[in-house]
């Protein structure tokens, strides 16, 4: 029996896939499962997505694409990692294709490799991609790659429909489309597609955080973080606990310890702010979160071996990644991907 684990909800994942499909029925999703499926464990998530009809996947690195093929994926797009010439037969066999993210690939000879490519155009993110204004380079890339060019894509810096940046970036992307070959897969939007107007020329989109339950009404968080109480004691009035005694008891207080800390990805900035769930309802986190342990104030009927919900929902309460993120000044993406791989992921 584990003393800490993360649960991946197959029902919530299914709900999210269905909602995304209902919202964007004319676009085929390319599921983004980078960074180990946003910390959910790609080995757990990818087979479930396949069961729900998702057949296309995207990751950042080629090594992750090779791993995904072991989980059953047969169409994988590498977003930002150059191919290796001695791996082309393996890429082809495993259905791996690559985004062209730098015009230098032309001079490096990478575009002559016998694999499929998507042209990644920088229209304003200014992070990676061939700049939209390098029209001669774009034409040359299309010519060299020829029928191995499978798609054209970009990444928006702001996907909200009322954004001036969106209007500017979409106009730039349209300019590139006007000089690109016809019949390509076209994808430039991510989970923000659920909010903004559909792009009439798009054939696909790349949902990421929405698959995992965040960013749009009706989505359900997929990952819960749980642990068992490993120690309990009564803290007397006037006594503090943990490093620096940042919390001090004003009355006899039942304290329980769980074996999760910032080494597991439970942020230290949650100290004296977080809540958790138990059979007795809400628990208040007290004292400084340490590397491997965290303490909570709890009713006396919460005892060693009891399950504590550190992230998730319970009867009468919830504390999800977006709520954690708000407390520590970050985004749910970072909360989810920070959970250490040493915490087992379990499909439920």
From Swiss-Prot:
Cystine crosslinks: none
Pathway where it operates: Amino-acid biosynthesis; D-alanine biosynthesis; D-alanine from L-alanine: step 1/1
Gene3D superfamilies, sorted: Alanine racemase (3.20.20.10), Lyase, Ornithine Decarboxylase, Chain A, domain 1 (2.40.37.10)
InterPro entries found in the cross-reference section: Ala_racemase, Ala_racemase/Decarboxylase_C, Ala_racemase_C, Ala_racemase_N, Ala_racemase_pyridoxalP-BS, PLP-binding_barrel
Biological function: Catalyzes the interconversion of L-alanine and D-alanine. May also act on other amino acids.
Family: Belongs to the alanine racemase family.
Name of the molecule in the record: Alanine racemase
